[in-house]
Every structure is written in C-alpha cells, then in structure tokens.
Amino acid sequence: MKPCILPWINFSTNTFGRPRVCGYSGVKTPTKLKDSDISTEWNSEYFKEIRKDFLNGEWPENCKRCKYVESLDGISKRMDENGFWYDQYKHLIDQTADDGSVPYEPPHIDVRTGMICNLKCIHCGTGASSKWQEDKALLDKYPNTENYQINNKWIEQEHGFWNHLRNTWHQTKRYNFLGGESFANKRHNEFLKDLSETEYAKDVNLAYVSNGTLITEDRLEQLSKFKSVVLRLSVDALERAGEYFRFPIKWDVYVEQLRLIDKFIKGKPNFDVGVQWTCSNVSMFYLVETYDIIRKEFPNIKFLFCNHVEWPIHMSAQNLPKEIKDVILNKINNYKFKDRDLDSFPFYVNHMMEKDLWKEHGKTLMQYLDDLDAARNISWNYSFQEMELHKYDPR
C-alpha cells in the first residue's frame, strides 16, 4: 500500500484546536494548540507513529475511515490526496528519521477556524457550529448536541495563532480552511486580507470548505489574487429539504449566491469550485434531484461526492427503512450520472446497504426531527414530504 502523503505535508486541527493529520482522523490527540505550537506538534508522537505505520505498510489506527472506504471499493481521502500531491512531495518521505520525525515545517496548513458559524445543519452539531447553542431544548439530548464549554478565543478572537501563521508566510504553500464557517471568523478574514496584499499571495494555494452564504464578489476578487483557490460549497439537498437540512438558509437566496459564484469564476482557471455533498439518510434520498439541478444550472461548478456521516449515527444513510432505501436505489439506477462520477457514487450505495440501523436508531431519528421542529418552528413532514417518513415511524 502506498503511504498517504498527508502525514508528511499537512498539519491539521479540529474545531477545538487539537492537532491531527486531516479531517478524517480517528484518534483524539491530548494537546491543544492554545497550549502548544505547530512546530512542536508536527513531530509529536501522534504524527511520528502514523508516519512509521505507513512506512511499515500498515493502516494507522488514526486512518480507519479511509480503510473502510477502500474496503467497499470507494475512493478514499488517501487516494484523492495522493492523486493531488504524492508525486510532488514523495521525496519528503525519504527524510523521515527512524523515530518518525521529519526535519522541516509542514508545507500545508489545514485549519479549523473554530466553531463560529451562521448555520446549524442537522447532520452537524454543537462541536462545529456555535449557532446550535440557540436550540436550548436539544442541548445534551443527542450525541451531536453536547453542551460544550469550550474557550475558542485562541482562534476566534486572539491574534497569537494567526501571527504564528504570518511568520511562516515565506514557506507555507497551501492553506486549507474549514469551520465552523471560516468567512464568519474575523481573525481569519484579517489574515486573508493581509496575506492577499503580500508578495507571497501569487505563490499560495488556498482551499476552503464553506457553506458559501458569506461569499461576496469583493471576497472573490480578493481570492483571485492567489495562485489557486479550491472552493467546496456544502450542499446536501435542494429547495424545502435543503432549507431544513442547512437551517436557516433560504433556497432561492442560496441559488442566487451560487449564480454569483458561477458567473465570477467563468474563464478563471485558478478557481476550482464544486458543491460538496455529504451522504446522510436525508441527503441520500435527494441525491438525484440535487445532482441534477447543480449539473443543469451551474455549468462552472462541479458536483462532488465527498463524505459520509458516521456520527451522529442517527443521521447515517444506514439508518433508513428498507422501503425508503429501495426508493433511493430505484432513483439512482434510473438516473444517468456523468461519466466522471461513475466511480464515485457506488460507494455511498454500498455503504447505505451494508447495514440496517433502522430498528436500533430509527426512533432516535424521528424524535430528533420532532425536537428540531419544536426548537426551530419548522416541519420535517413538510420539508421531507417525498420521503414519507411518517409511514415508518417506529415509535
């Protein structure tokens, strides 16, 4: 097995500032960046052990998610990232010491910009969006609604971490920002503005996963100063279903936002923009319709199969009645996807069908939706009416 290149090039954090190799990491590290720094953590035992495991031809404990995807013949993050970066950076692997350490700073910085967010998506939760704190009745009731008492001032308000990044502008070639919502973070926005005005910007690659709601034409002009911009916009369902899923967006407003972006990037090869779809029980049902509208309405924006929900488990695509899974299979089998996607979507079908979690977690999903309705004055029965979930309510 070819090693994943990320442990040799990428330093990442979660929303609480814990170091990790990437967003799919399965091991929780004990240290937080507010108590340490990137240089120290880059050669921590966590990173060193992962490098050594890959060099020994073994899957690290940290990387179970990619191992699972590949076991179902899916395209894993390891495969994707190696496709982008392995040939460019494979020489760095040879610099690995016997203890797994490397003698250089990470060329890629992958930063979770805290929990500040303007949406509260139903497959997300309090650990990634501050807006969930509005739903007081749901706090501590579900796995994804834990009432965290986390001090994220180090990344959301204070300057120390961001100044550390400024000090390495001359050697960092790529920044990958995720939230929360990065464009809602004032310190991030200041950092981006400052970097865009330097001599280094033309040599820096940027990547974002964003909900897209805060991207303006001025912001796009600012981003255009960089060598390249990979922009991934989170979309899981359309119209009524999309408004419920990514509350409190308004679909018509969001469509205009996509039109603005689609128009701006036309003819600009340094922009790579795609909507990033995550497989869940709800988004799987609306996959074909969502794929179709992106395909037809936004010619410069790609549809990308990017992720699947494992947690909270009640939002997993495996947590659906068999009858609804059969409807989904029928819709997918009767739709002609683009040739470039024919190798991408089968994993999500295989994942959905691998397990039947409805008997164990169906009640939790239905109660969760009822609680969301009460907290947000919305209606799952209206928003997801095509699913006819009420027919299978096991309570």
Set out the residue ranges of the language-model regions.
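Metal-dependent nucleotidyl/phosphoryl-transfer cores and adjacent nucleic-acid-binding surfaces
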Residues: 59-65, 76, 104-105, 176, ...
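Conserved C-terminal portion of the radical SAM core fold
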Residues: 15-16, 207, 226-232, 252-394
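Alpha-helix termini
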Residues: 162-167, 195-201, 221, 262-270, ...
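N-terminal pre-core extensions flanking Radical SAM catalytic domains
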Residues: 1-151, 168-169, 341-395
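Non-transmembrane alpha-helical segments in soluble domains
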Residues: 39-42, 64, 121, 166, ...
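Distinct, well-ordered alpha-helical segments
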Residues: 187-193, 216-223, 286-290
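A structural signal for well-ordered alpha-helical scaffolds and beta->alpha junctions
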Residues: 34-35, 42-48, 56-63, 106, ...
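Core AdoMet radical
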Residues: 106-116, 125-157, 170-186, 198-217, ...
